[in-house]
Each structure stands twice: as C-alpha cells, then as structure tokens.
Amino acid sequence: MPEIEQDDAAAETVDSSTVKFGTPEALEYVRSLTDVGAMTRLLHECIAYQRSLDSDLDTLLSQRTELDRNLVQLQRSAEILDIVKADADHMLGNVRSTCDLADQVSGKVRELDLAQSRVNVTLSRIDAIVERGNCIEGVKTALESEDYESAAKFVQRFLQIDLQYKDSGSDQSEQLHASKEQLEGIAKKKLLAAIDQRDHPTILRFVRLYSPLGMETEGLQLYVGYLKKVIALRGRMEYENVVELMEQGLGQVNFVGCLTNLFKDIVMAIEENDEILRGLCGEDGVAYAICELQEECDLRGSLILKKYMDFRKLAILASDINNSPNLNILPGGASEGPDPREVELYVEEILSLMQLGEDYTEFMVSKIKSLTSVDPELLPTATKAFRNKSFSKAIQDVTRYYVILEGFFMVENVRKAIRIDEHVPDSLTTSMVDDVFYVLQSCLRRAISTSNISSVIAVLSYAGSLLGNDYHEALQQKIREPNLGARLFLGGIGVENTGTEIATALNNMDVSCEYILKLKHEIEEQCTEVFPAPADRERIKSCLSELGELSSTFKQLLNSGMEQLVATVTPRIRPVLDTVATISYELTETEYAENEVNDPWVQRLLHSVETNAAWLQPLMTSNNYDSFLHLIIDFIVKRLEVIMMQKRFSQLGGLQLDRDTRALVSHFSGMTQRTVRDKFARLTQMATILNLEKVSEILDFWGENSGPMTWRLTPAEVRRVLGLRVEFKPESIAALKL
C-alpha cells in the first residue's frame, strides 16, 4: 500500500514540525514514528534543541557569580530592614498620638467658636433691642420737634432691625408702628397741602419721606400727579392765550410756540426730577412718570393741533383743493384758488408742528430705551402709548393736510414757472427749467423732513405727475411749432433768433434730463438716512425709478427734436455731397499731386458744415452740440459710403480717399468733444483696402492677422471694395478665402 505509507510519512512530517521537546507528548510522538526519514529529521531537531539548551545553561551559569553577590547584599539588607521597621513603628505611634491630640484640640475650638457665635448673636440682639429703643425714643423726640426727616430715618432703621430680628420686641414694634402711622399721616397731610398750594420745596421735603417709610409707590403716584397738575395748568394757560388771540382776530397766533412750551414742560419735568423719581422707585419711577405725563401731552397736544386746524380752516381748504377741477394735477393753465404764498406759510407751520412732535416722541422713546432695569414688556407698551394715542392721531390728521397743501403748492408754482417762462440773459436755458426743479427740490426736501414715508411717497407722486404732464408738454411746445425749419434759414442765412429758440428748447430738454437724475440721486441719499427700514426704502426706490423713466422719456424727446433740427440742416449740406459723386478717383500721379494743392471737395464740405451748423455752437449746451454735430457726421458718412461704393479707384485714388478721410476726421475731432474716429472706420477701412498692391495682401490684415483692428466691413463688402480697384481682376477677388 504505497499510497498509505506516503500519507503516513506526510503526516509524520507535518507533526514533527509542531513537537515540543521535553514533554510527554513528544515522547509519545517518538514512539509512534515508523518512517526512518521522519525519525532522522526528528533526531536532528532534537540534537539542535539540546544544543540550544546547552547554550542557555552556559549563559545562566555565567551569571552565577553576579547572582551570588546580589544574594549576599540582600541578606545584609534584611538586617537593616528590621531596624527601619522598628523606627517606622515608633513614628506611627507618635503620629497617632498627635492625631488624637489634634482631634481633641479642634473639638474644643469648635465648641469655643460655637459659644462665641452664640455670644455674638446675643450681643447683636441686645444691641438691636437697645437700638430699637433708641429708634422709638428718636421718633418720638423728632416728631415733637417736627424733625420729620430724622423721624423717618429712625423708622427706616427700626424696620430694618425688625426685619432682621422678627421674633423679638413685639412691644417695641407696636410702639414704633404707632409712631410710624403718625408720621405717615403727617407726611401725607403736609404733602397734599403743599401740592394744593404748589409749594415745590415743601413738596420735595415731604415726598422724600415716603421712601424711608416704605411708601415709595404711593409717593411716586402723588408726586407724578403733582407734576401732571403743574403741566396741565401751564398748558391750559398757554392754550387759553392762543384761543384769546384767535377770538381777537389777530393773524399772528403762535401755535408752534404753544406746542413747544408744552413739550418743554414735560421734558423738563422728567429731566429735573430724575433724582426724585429714581429715589422713589428707581428706573421704574422714571418710566411711570414718562407714561403718565404722556397722557397730558395727548390731551393738551391734540387740543392745540385741532385748534390750529380750525384756525387755518385746513379742512375747508383741503376740500376746495380736492374738489376744484382747476387744482388737480393734470395738464392745465392758470388756476383759481388759495394764494400759494399763504399755502406755503401753512405748510411751513405744519412742518414745524410735525417736526416738534417727532422730535419730542423720539426723545421720550429713547429715554425709555435707555432704562436698562425696567420691565422688558414696558418698552413696547410705552412706545405704543406714544404712537397710537390721541396726539399721534392728531399729527396724522395734520400730515394728511400737509400732503394736500404741499401738492397744491407744487402744482401752482410749477405751472406758474411754466407760464412766466422767459429767456434768461447769458443762460442757455429759459427760466422755467431752474424754477421748476427748484420748486420740486424744495417740496421734496420738506416732505423728507417730516420723516413720514407716506408724505414722501405722495409728494414724489405729485412731482412725477407734474414732470410727466405739464412740464413735458411745455418742453415739446417749441419743437412742435410749424415751419420752424423754414424760419431757421430765411434767405439762406441762419436766423439767430430762431436758432436761439430751437437751441434753447433743446437745451431745456438736455438740462432737464440732468436735473432729474440729480434730483433722484439727492432724494435717494436723503431717504436712505431718514428711512432705514428695508420696506420703506423699497417703496421709495419704486417711486424714484419712475423719475428715472421720465429722464429717459425726456432724452427720447430731445433725440426727436435733435433729429428735426438735423433734418433742417442736412438739405443745405447735401448739394456739396452730391458733387462728390462727379469727382473721379481713377487718378494719375499728376492728378493726385493737383488734388493735394487744390482739394476737390473736402474743404467745401467742411465749409458748408461750419456755415450751417457751427453758428449754433454758442447757443447750445456742449452735450447738445456734440449730439447735433454727430448726427450731421452720421449723415455725411452714410452718404459718402454710398457714393464711394459707386466709384472706381486707382491705387492713387485709394490714397486720395485715405487723405480725404483723414482730413474729415481731423477737422471734426476739433469741432466736438466726443471721438469721431469710429464713425469714419468703414471709410478708413475702404481706403486701406484700395491702397493694397495686390488682392492677396488683404489676407495680411484679415482674420487672425487683423491685430487690434476690428473690421467694420463684412466679407462681401470687402470683396465689393476690392472690385472697385481698376487694377484688380475679378477672378483674383473671387479666389479669396475670407
């Protein structure tokens, strides 16, 4: 069975690698071996294992001397350890005795400390009893001598002691409380009497007694009530004085001063009595006083505003303005109604009243916000009291009248400026432009000063309507006049008066576009400062965008008027351009040299432009004159391009075209502040093509080889221009790959 023997040999080989010599398992394994080869291998492994053991034994034996020496040292150390142990036991005994002694001492100390604490408490109680007795005697003595301040201090000190030692001196407490009640009665009686007599020093004396007596809240209420009475009395006197002046029919009734005095009294009452109010109830006392005095402001302030509205008959005036068909903001002529100068006076008065109310409200709200230790719910409550009560509603009524009056004032003055429009010496515009935008600027500034977003939006709407209707119509009027072009060149010569009228009308449009954008920018900046809320800014931005659209509308109107003017001038230039069609560009060297001396057409064209257009320069704004001149240049360039595309050129003719184009660019560049080179780009590129030596040279300038030059001619136009050269063959041009 060879296969079985091989398997046994393999198993023995595998098992021999895991034998651990010196163990019973190894001995059993050796006895089980049957293969000589396995036995031989195991024998060699056993011999190797024996050699490793011999080596380990030699190593251990080499350390014997060192180990013996260490063992001797350990034996000596054992003797020392016995001595150390004895010393340690002795020290442990000492520590234990010391610990026991410390425990005994600390216990005695704790007992002494407890006894001392009890003695101190007892002494404190004795001192308290003595001091309570002193307080009782002090109160009685102070009351007898009417030294109420000292009596209040004694009461306060007694109450503090009584709060600390609640279980002692009930008899003393009864005596003190009797004296306290007596002092409270005296303080209240004296305070009420002083309030009735408005004896301020006495009021201050007795209201200060309420805090040490623990009656802070009652004292605060009485003192703030006194302040309200004083303010009410002064406010009533001011109001009655105003009513008396009204009944006497006197025109100068100072409502602004009356309201100012009311606000001043309230603010001074808060500021000057801050210490008293804080002494009674801290910052809560200040907040309480502000809210209480605001009630007086609501009462007196709303009465003043209502009386002002009655005095100026604002309701009737507003009704007349709203109901009159001549006073609405639609295109129209002169209106009949209130005198705008009186209305402006009313507007200024209303603005003063509104500004006073806003300043007062902002001050008082900021005063409340500065109080850090008050109830967090007090701030929104107080703010609501300022924003939603009767005075605030009266301000809203006045604001509505302001918007109506401001709108009327704006409409009347803008229409008046349009009606009395006249030429201003040494000015390029008529009086209407500056006058109208001054009125709009003034009215919008006033509206912003109200800090009322609705007022600003309404006045902005008025301004936009006026500019889009009345003012727009006034700007168009001159341009729409019939036969304006015919009158511009009567007898073949530019008529200065007509030119001035046309130029001024166009200048009005140009300057108006600029003024609208300036006004828009100014209003936007001011509103950004006054109205920080994002929602308010969005509303204003929406209204201002309409002003921007009006500027674009005026710009379109200006362009239309400018085109009409150019259409009047260009027929006088066209004859010179028509002569260019008769001039040959198939030049010989002699003809080219002759043209250099005697220009065939460029100078005549420039002279025609100077004669028919340049005389308008001093009459126009620089922007308008540049636009006017550029429109003429556009006309000239387009006509020249058409003419040149119909000609035939020699190479010298191409040079002549380049020279002519350069002369035009140079001259026109001196006439205008804007660049004109781009307008002649196509002609310049035509001249470049016509100057080439051969057709293929165009590839040096085309496509990737064009460099910084941008081609204005299409590939088809380039082929057409190449075809204008008499020397170039059509088949060469057709072969070009552009």
UniProtKB/Swiss-Prot annotation:
InterPro entries: COG4, COG4_C, COG4_M, COG4_N. The keyword Transport applies. One of its GO terms (biological process) is protein transport. It is found in: Golgi apparatus membrane. GO terms for cellular component: Golgi membrane. Its main location: Golgi. It comes from the Eukaryota. It is a peripheral membrane protein. Pfam families: COG4_C, COG4_m, COG4_N. Keywords: Golgi apparatus, Membrane, Protein transport, Transport. Belongs to the COG4 family. Component of the conserved oligomeric Golgi complex which is composed of eight different subunits and is required for normal Golgi morphology and localization. Interacts with COG2 and COG3. Required for normal Golgi function. This is Conserved oligomeric Golgi complex subunit 4. The lineage of its organism: Eukaryota, Viridiplantae, Streptophyta, Embryophyta, Tracheophyta.
